[in-house]
Amino acid sequence: MSTLEIEVGDLRARSVEFTPTELVVTLMDGRRIATPLDWYPRLLKASAAQRANYEIMAMGIHWPDLDEDLSVAGMLKGQKAY
């Protein structure tokens, strides 16, 4: 596998946390991805309870109270939500 290839299994989220300015996702292999919270307006405006109510899906994270879905691959690519 080249260094540019990413195995899908490597992208599974294990946990989600928030700092005042970032969304931080820890992957199953221990890596952490931190992205600016202002990239995701729904999450930025959400209450702590709404942010805490998330579901880890096969390829990303879903917040049912917010109807927000983020893929781990999208976070790595720097894709912002609109």
Feature locations, PLM:
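Motif-centric detector for short Cys/His coordination patterns
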Residues: M1-Y82
